[in-house]
Amino acid sequence: MYQPSRGAARRLGPCLRAYQARPQDQLYPGTLPFPPLWPHSTTTTSPSSPLFWSPLPPRLPTQRLPQVPPLPLPQIQALSSAWVVLPPGKGEEGPGPELHSGCLDGLRSLFEGPPCPYPGAWIPFQVPGTAHPSPATPSGDPSMEEHLSVMYERLRQELPKLFLQSHDYSLYSLDVEFINEILNIRTKGRTWYILSLTLCRFLAWNYFAHLRLEVLQLTRHPENWTLQARWRLVGLPVHLLFLRFYKRDKDEHYRTYDAYSTFYLNSSGLICRHRLDKLMPSHSPPTPVKKLLVGALVALGLSEPEPDLNLCSKP
C-alpha cells in the first residue's frame, strides 16, 4: 500500500484538517442498498453481510375449481371461428371432431393443388367448389348475343364479295390470329392478316380465269362466341380456258373447292381469330350427254362397264 512521505504529509496536513465530510459520506456503509443478484431475490444485500440465496416467497394455497362436465358435440357452436362442428354422422368419417366439408376441401387444396412449374412461382389459390368462368363461354350474356347478330349480318354481306371487292378489315381486332390450314399459314396481327388474305386472292386470281364465292351456310354459336361459315369457291382454271378455247360451253371445266371458316369473337364484338379448314373438293357432276353416250355404247355391246375397284386381277 502506498504510504505518503513525511514531506507530502507535512504539505497536505492543513488541507486534510480543513476537509469536512459531506452528509452523504457520513452514512454507515452497511446501510447502502445493493441490488439483488437474482430476480427471484426480494431482499437487498450489503457488503458487510455475507452473500446467501434468499428463499422464494411462499405460495398461496390454491383451491381446485369445480370441473364442469363437457357438453356433447352437437351443442357446441363456433361463432367466431371458421371451423364449424357438425353433429356426428353429417361430416366426413373418421376419429376426432367433425369438420365442415368446405374446411376439409380447403385443406386438401393446399396439398393436392397443381404442381409448381418452377421454384418461387406464384400459384393463385382457388376456392374449392368454384369454377373459373371461361372467356369463351358467354353464359347468356345479352351483349354477346347482340355482337353475334351484328357480325352475322356484316359477314353475310362481306363474304360473297371477298374475292371481288376490297374487304372491310374493321371487323377484325388489332391482334387477330389467322390459321390457314390450306396453305399452312399462321399469322397474328391485322397487318399480317391483310397480307395473308391479299396473297390468297392473288393466288386465286392467277389460277382461275373466272371466279366466284358462294356462301353455302352461315351459323351462329353463342355457346363459344363463334360464327361458322361453309363456302365454296367456283372458278374456271386458266389452262383449261386456253386448251378448250374452241368449246362454247365451258361449264364442265369449272372446278369447285369447299372450305370451312370459323370466326371467333372477343368481348368487344370483333373477330379475334379466323380459322380456315379445307374440305374435300366436290367434283362436278357428269353431263347428261355423257350419260346417254355411255348408255348407248353399253346397250350396243361396244363397251363393257368396268367396276371402280377391281379386287381380282384379270387372267
Curated annotation (Swiss-Prot):
A Pfam family annotated for this UniProt entry: DUF2358
InterPro entries linked: DUF2358 (IPR018790)
Protein's name according to its UniProt entry: Uncharacterized protein C6orf136
Gene field: C6orf136
Superkingdom of the source species: Eukaryota
